Each structure stands twice: as C-alpha cells, then as structure tokens.
C-alpha cells in the first residue's frame, strides 16, 4: 500500500540522517520534497544527535510548507528554514536567499531526496537535476536518495503508479540500472544502492524488504 511505502521512506530517512549526523559529522541538510510533516523529520533526527544541525526544507506545495512552518521548529542553535520551490528547477533552489541564509555551501551538506525522484519524468532530465545540486555542494557532502522501482513486484508497482497518475501526480518507477546514474561520481556508503528497507536496517525491523518497492542509497562526494 501507499502507506507502507511512505512509512518505509520515513524509516530510511531516519536511519540515513542518523548515520550522517552521528558517523559522518554532517551538521547541515538540504531536504527537497519534504512532504507533509510527521514524526522523524530531518531536523528531529539530526538535532537529537547534534542540536546545532541546520536544515533547509524545500517543497513545491504551498500547503505542505504552511504545515511545515506551523509544526516544525528548530533549536536555538540549529535553525530550520523553508522555501517553496520546484526540484525541476535546481538553479532556482540554489540561488534562493534562504540557502545562503541557512546553509554554508563551503562546508559539507547532506542532500536529501527521499520519496521525490519518482515525481520526475524522464523528460525532466532527473540525472541533470541531481548532478546540478551535487555539483554545488562541498567535497565531503552526501546524497541520500530513494527511487521507487518495478523490480520487486511489477504488478503492485504498476497499480500504485497508476493510482498516483490518476490523481494527477507523476509516478515514474525506475529499475536499478536507471537509478544507479543518480550516484555518478559519488562514493556509495555500504551496503550500496539496495532495496530501501535493507539499508542498514534497525535490529528490530520485521518488514519484508521486498514489500517496499524502492531502492535507497547514501553516497559521499569525494
């Protein structure tokens, strides 16, 4: 179900951001495609480890941003900011004054693209979009990315995608081979680009990894 996929995305986000904050020393995040706030947002996870962590949230939905502004607050030492912008226009995101006001792009950043890549059609040139964002970041930055896929259960994924498209929301699942290029030039962190639920799973994880129709990976910019 869609709920299963969303819950799995949120769990992957938590594991990845915890790893980056605790083990990789990342203290600032750019989260694009934020979605409606719920428990375990990027700043919740990061600031639990390092209260000074700064987060800039980006979403193209004004309703999402209204909710986010109302519900998501940073700490005194770790500001949180929000901008309305479209992932398909990465240059506009990077040039927004809120980026310079919240993040120091001369220092490593965690770029979070979870549950958003499938909204990009191939003619949006998603590889260029990711590359443009990564190119703007300092060496030592990280990309956290998920991508829905038909590889595990083609029929179920087709049904989910059709339901999404019917509601006017693009949903483009991609194979492993079509997802790998998003990480071009980056160093994948173990265990690599894998079924999302199997990326450093929590010890008590009971979910069948193949019931989550997505790949997930974390990679470092050298």
Placement of each model-derived feature along the sequence:
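Short, glycine-/aromatic-enriched active-site segment of Class I SAM-dependent methyltransferases
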Residues: 153-168
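Class I SAM-dependent methyltransferase SAM/SAH-binding core
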Residues: 37, 41-88
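Conserved beta-strand signature within the Rossmann-like core of class I S-adenosyl-L-methionine
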Residues: 83, 109-113, 129-130, 136-148
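Short "lid" loop at the C-terminus of a central beta-strand within the Rossmann-like core
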Residues: 116-119, 148-152
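Core SAM-dependent methyltransferase catalytic element
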Residues: 192, 197-222
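A short SAM/SAH-binding and catalytic strip from SAM-dependent methyltransferases
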Residues: 87-88, 93, 97-127, 133
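Short alpha-helix
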Residues: 169-193
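Class I SAM-dependent methyltransferase Rossmann-like catalytic core
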Residues: 1-28, 32
């Amino acid at each position: 179900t869609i709920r299963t996929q969303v819950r799995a995305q949120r769990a992957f986000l938590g594991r990845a951001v915890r790893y980056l904050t605790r083990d990789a020393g990342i203290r600032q995040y750019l989260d694009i495609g934020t979605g409606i706030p719920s428990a375990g947002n990027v700043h919740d996870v990061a600031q639990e480890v390092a209260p000074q962590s700064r987060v800039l949230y980006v979403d193209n939905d004004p309703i999402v941003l209204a909710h986010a502004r109302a519900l998501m607050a940073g700490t005194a030492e770790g500001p949180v900011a929000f901008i309305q912008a479209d992932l398909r226009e990465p240059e506009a995101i990077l040039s927004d004054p809120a980026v310079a006001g919240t993040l120091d792009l001369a220092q490593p950043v965690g770029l979070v693209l979870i549950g958003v890549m499938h909204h990009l059609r191939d003619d949006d040139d998603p590889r260029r979009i990711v590359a443009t964002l990564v190119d703007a970041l300092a060496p030592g930055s990280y990309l956290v990315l998920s991508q829905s896929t038909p590889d595990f259960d083609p029929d179920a994924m087709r049904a989910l995608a059709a339901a999404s498209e019917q509601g006017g929301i693009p949903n483009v699942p991609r194979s492993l081979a079509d997802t790998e290029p998003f990480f071009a030039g980056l160093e994948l962190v173990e265990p690599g680009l894998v079924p999302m639920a199997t990326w450093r799973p929590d010890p008590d994880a009971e979910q069948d990894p193949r019931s989550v129709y997505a790949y997930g990976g974390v990679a470092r910019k050298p």
